[in-house]
Amino acid sequence: MSRVAKAPVVIPAGVEVKLNGQVISIKGKNGELTRTVHNAVEVKQEANALTFAPREGFANAWAQAGTTRALLNAMVVGVTEGFTKKLQLVGVGYRAAVKGNVVNLALGFSHPVDHQLPAGITAECPSQTEIVLKGADKQVIGQVAADLRAYRRPEPYKGKGVRYADEVVRTKEAKKK
């Protein structure tokens, strides 16, 4: 049985929550996020908190309730504080630049790589080898970071490539003759 679902999600001041059946909208200073909740979960709004309860007749209702609580908590944090993800480019000649909502990457290919950012996500480059992604939706931030990393994943011998700032790349030893 999930213990996560038993804790309510506290709604801070300045955040507006709308319940419309199974569709929940959360609006704050960083924008508005909407999510459809699984049928096995019943969400109730009480004063300044959201509570979660499983519905009868579903085998995985407690698990779904815990997942829903975690997702809605991430939405509340996203519209109040926002999320950031940092990427590093390691390698000779690997550079990044941001022009509007397009991230331009030079990753050792014969052509530059242009990645279009989705709505609600902003990027900035404090240096040529760093990218900082910011936005309200935790899932979209993670997906964009994974897409950028997928262009040139860190290779295991020298560690060159695009990596998360907190990622530790284990390097192998080169083959000896």
Curated annotation (Swiss-Prot):
Transmembrane segments: none annotated. The keyword Ribosomal protein applies. The keyword RNA-binding applies. GO terms for molecular function: rRNA binding; structural constituent of ribosome. One of its GO terms (biological process) is cytoplasmic translation. One of its GO terms (cellular component) is cytosolic large ribosomal subunit. InterPro entries: Ribosomal_uL6-like, Ribosomal_uL6-like_a/b-dom_sf, Ribosomal_uL6_a/b-dom, Ribosomal_uL6_bac-type, Ribosomal_uL6_CS. This protein binds to the 23S rRNA, and is important in its secondary structure. It is located near the subunit interface in the base of the L7/L12 stalk, and near the tRNA binding site of the peptidyltransferase center. This is Large ribosomal subunit protein uL6. It comes from Serratia proteamaculans (strain 568). The lineage of its organism: Bacteria, Pseudomonadati, Pseudomonadota, Gammaproteobacteria, Enterobacterales.
